Amino acid sequence: MDNQQRRTDNMASGETDHLQCVEEPQPGDLIEIFRPAYQHWALYLGDGYIINLTPVDEGQATAVSSVKSVFSRKAVVRMQLLKEVVGADSYRINNKYDDDHTPLPVSEIIQRAQMLIGQEVSYDLLGSNCEHFVTLLRYGEGVSEQASRAIGAISLVTAAASAFSVLGLINTRSRNRPF
């Protein structure tokens, strides 16, 4: 069964975002892990192992879902057991970009991933996060819906702040007129 069919079957069976994944991931699958304040992403390698980004100072044990990982500027590429990274959180297989991006051959995905294990990489929540990392491995292009949502929220707040500043400036000028 291909990834698109497995994803469709999961949705048809009523699997929701916060249920523990009941099917076995296949090498090359994207794994979405639901942390309390964000989603962490990993790529399944096989035999229970994933590759993911962890903050440089977090060490091997990453079951702790620290928010500091979101604000870290550097990350290390680690190969870890999926069950240890997930801990008490929930996860699902989520190859959501397969409709728009063609996955690379599984052997190439795994080879590219294994070459990066142990390397330190730059991390940026908006431009180079864990979702960008795993989608770059799977598709050859880094994509992050989570980053796009964050950029949209920041843009909205900035636009609102600008509008209030302009309105405040207009209001102040109209009160200071002598006539």
UniProtKB/Swiss-Prot annotation:
Expressed in the eye lens. The active site is at 40, 130 (acyl-thioester intermediate). It holds the Pfam family LRAT. Disruption phenotype: Knockout animals exhibit normal growth of their body and eye lens. However, the disappearance of mitochondria and the endoplasmic reticulum in the lens is almost completely suppressed and membranous structures persisted in the lens central region. Residues 1-149 are cytoplasmic. The chain crosses the membrane at residues 150-170. The keyword Transmembrane applies. It is a single-pass membrane protein. The keyword Transmembrane applies. Gene3D superfamilies: endopeptidase domain like (from Nostoc punctiforme). Belongs to the H-rev107 family. InterPro entries: H-rev107_PLA/AT, LRAT_dom. It is found in: Membrane; Cytoplasm, Cytosol; Mitochondrion membrane; Lysosome membrane. Keywords: Cytoplasm, Endoplasmic reticulum, Hydrolase, Lipid degradation, Lipid metabolism, Lysosome, Membrane, Mitochondrion, Transferase, Transmembrane, Transmembrane helix. Residues 171-179 are lumenal. Residues 30-146 form the LRAT domain. One of its GO terms (molecular function) is phospholipase A2 activity. The C-terminal transmembrane domain is required for the targeting of the protein to damaged organelles. GO terms for biological process: lens fiber cell differentiation; lipid catabolic process; N-acylphosphatidylethanolamine metabolic process; organelle disassembly. This is Phospholipase A and acyltransferase 1. Its EC number is 2.3.1.-, 3.1.1.32, 3.1.1.4. One of its GO terms (cellular component) is cytosol. PROSITE patterns: LRAT. Exhibits both phospholipase A1/2 and acyltransferase activities. Shows phospholipase A1 (PLA1) and A2 (PLA2) activity, catalyzing the calcium-independent release of fatty acids from the sn-1 or sn-2 position of glycerophospholipids. Shows O-acyltransferase activity, catalyzing the transfer of a fatty acyl group from glycerophospholipid to the hydroxyl group of lysophospholipid.
